């Protein structure tokens, strides 16, 4: 999508968030003029200063400032939204600005997790997925060029969640039988690959799925590999599916949402529950010169310099 050797200009919403910051860094690493839209009162000043030192252009504003968004769109080629779950429907404001500007060559909505058009989840998570589907249908109805990215599980986040490397206990919780397969990828890789596909003509109006064969595993296999890495055996405490389903009904919103996500990923195995369609593409096949960090390599990182645990907003 680069013309005359010029790199595409990329605008990122949610660039200071958990996955968005990796997209900003990936965009800068690949040499793209990179704009980061942020609230005027953002608390992420240190991160924004880092982005600026790396060459990012920081634009402060609110999503309600329609005219400002339109003018900003006219300066860029590609728009990526990495807004968190509570802001999913705010993407309609981004879409309105894209439609008025009329020049955007590619829009990537805030997907990046499960492939929402292929799965069904328990009600608390299904309601969030449905909001993402609404954004997709609006993109298609407006004939906005798009790429939908299904990056599956964020590896650092879920290794921290499942294995609890910061917790010295001798027990590990297993959700369901622990035998459902799932795909997970290192957040830094997700950021870099997403920038690659955002400017790749082969990904235009397609679903790109991050499912390299080296990064498919079960909970039990993950625990076994971790035990070998650190030379320690854990007692596995299984939480049965019925108990998890019951919790999604008993807990208030939004506390029931993470439980429903655990069910979707690690009991239903949603990231591996569907076959590829003709218009899908698996990310690792596009770029033989790149390599996803394998789960084994990521566990080595956790042994020597574990990434800090993170929390998600719902």
From Swiss-Prot:
Instruction: Identify the catalytic residues.
Output: 132 (proton donor/acceptor)
Q: Which gene encodes it?
A: EGS1
What is the organism of origin for this protein?
Answer: Ocimum basilicum
Segments forming a coiled coil: none
Q: What is the effect of changing residue 314 to A?
A: Reduced activity
According to UniProt, residues marked as the site described as Required for activity are: 261
Briefly describe activity regulation.
Inhibited by zinc and copper ions. Repressed by 4-bromo-cinnamyl acetate. Desactivated by the competitive inhibitor EMDF ((7S,8S)-ethyl(7,8-methylene)-dihydroferulate).
Q: How does it assemble?
A: Homodimer.
Provide the tissue specificity: Trichome glands.
* Keyword NADP listed: yes
Query: What's the record's pH-dependence note?
Result: Optimum pH is 6.5.
What SUPFAM superfamilies does the entry give? NAD(P)-binding Rossmann-fold domains
EC number, as in UniProt: 1.1.1.318
Outcome of mutating residue 157 to A/F, per the record? Reduced activity
Q: What general EC class does the enzyme of this chain belong to?
A: oxidoreductase
Q: What catalytic reaction does the record list?
A: eugenol + acetate + NADP(+) = (E)-coniferyl acetate + NADPH; eugenol + a carboxylate + NADP(+) = a coniferyl ester + NADPH
Q: What is the effect of changing residue 132 to R?
A: Reduced activity
Where in the chain is the site Confers substrate specificity? 85, 88
Binding annotation for substrate: 114, 258
Q: Which GO terms describe its molecular function?
A: nucleotide binding; oxidoreductase activity; protein homodimerization activity
> Is the Oxidoreductase keyword given for this protein?
yes
Q: What is this protein called?
A: Eugenol synthase 1
Q: Which residues are noted in the entry as NADP(+)-binding?
A: 16-19, 38-44, 85-87, 110-112, 132, 152-154
Pathway, per record:
Aromatic compound metabolism; phenylpropanoid biosynthesis
């Amino acid at each position: 999508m680069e013309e005359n050797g010029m790199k595409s200009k990329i605008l990122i919403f949610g660039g200071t968030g958990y996955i968005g910051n990796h997209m900003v860094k990936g965009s800068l690493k690949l040499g793209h003029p990179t704009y980061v839209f942020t609230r005027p009162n953002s608390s992420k000043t240190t991160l924004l200063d880092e982005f600026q030192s790396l060459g990012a252009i920081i634009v402060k504003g609110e999503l309600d400032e329609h005219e400002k968004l339109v003018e900003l769109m006219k300066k860029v080629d590609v728009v990526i939204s990495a807004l968190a779950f509570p802001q999913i429907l705010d993407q309609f404001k981004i879409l309105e600005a894209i439609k008025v500007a009329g020049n955007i060559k590619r829009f990537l909505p805030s997907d990046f997790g499960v492939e929402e058009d292929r799965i069904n989840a328990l009600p608390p998570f299904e309601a969030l997925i449905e909001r993402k589907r609404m954004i997709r249908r609006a993109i298609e109805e407006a004939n906005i060029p798009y790429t939908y990215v299904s990056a599956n599980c964020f590896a650092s986040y879920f290794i921290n969640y499942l294995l609890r490397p910061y917790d010295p206990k001798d027990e590990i919780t297993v959700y369901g039988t622990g035998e459902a397969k799932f795909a997970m990828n290192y957040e830094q890789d997700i950021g870099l690959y997403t920038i690659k596909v955002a400017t790749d003509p082969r990904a235009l109006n397609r679903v790109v799925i991050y499912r390299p064969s080296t990064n498919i595993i079960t909970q039990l296999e993950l625990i076994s590999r971790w035990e070998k890495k650190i030379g320690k055996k854990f007692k596995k405490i299984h939480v049965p599916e019925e108990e998890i389903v019951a919790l999604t009904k008993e807990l208030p919103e939004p506390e029931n949402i993470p439980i429903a996500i655990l069910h979707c990923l690690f009991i239903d195995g949603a990231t591996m529950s569907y076959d590829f369609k003709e218009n899908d593409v698996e990310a690792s096949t596009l770029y033989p010169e790149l390599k996803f960090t394998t789960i084994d390599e990521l566990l080595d990182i956790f042994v020597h310099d574990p990434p800090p645990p993170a929390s998600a907003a719902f």
